[in-house]
A protein has these predicted regions:
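Short, cationic-aromatic polyanion-contact patches
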Residues: 3-18, 32, 64-76
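Residue-level detection of the helix-turn-helix DNA-binding "recognition helix"
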Residues: 26, 52, 56
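A short, conserved structural fragment
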Residues: 55-65
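Short amphipathic alpha-helical interface segments
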Residues: 14-39
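Short loop/turn and capping residues at structural boundaries
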Residues: 36, 48, 65-66
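Short amphipathic alpha-helical interaction segments
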Residues: 42-53
């Protein structure tokens, strides 16, 4: 498999996981990263990449709280 093919697959996985996160937040409201990681049941690095995607696109708000992060959807 070429690097491009690997990268395309990874982008797809990040996008799908970002969608799962968005739907979870839409149904459950504000959650901590720990709660989200348990609910989504994907590798943490993939969840972090997907959160980065959503944050960069302006879809979520991340706030550091002690040793965790609070995550919520940005409601316009």
């Amino acid at each position: 498999m070429t690097l491009l093919a690997k990268g395309g697959k990874m982008i797809t996985e990040i996008g799908i996981t970002a969608g799962d996160i968005w739907h979870y937040l839409d149904h459950h409201g504000d959650v901590t990263f720990t709660q989200l990681a348990q609910a989504i049941d994907m590798p943490k690095d993939l969840i972090f990449m997907s959160l980065g995607w959503l944050a960069r696109e302006g879809h979520i708000i991340l706030n550091k709280e002690a040793d965790n992060y609070k995550i919520s959807l940005r409601r316009s």
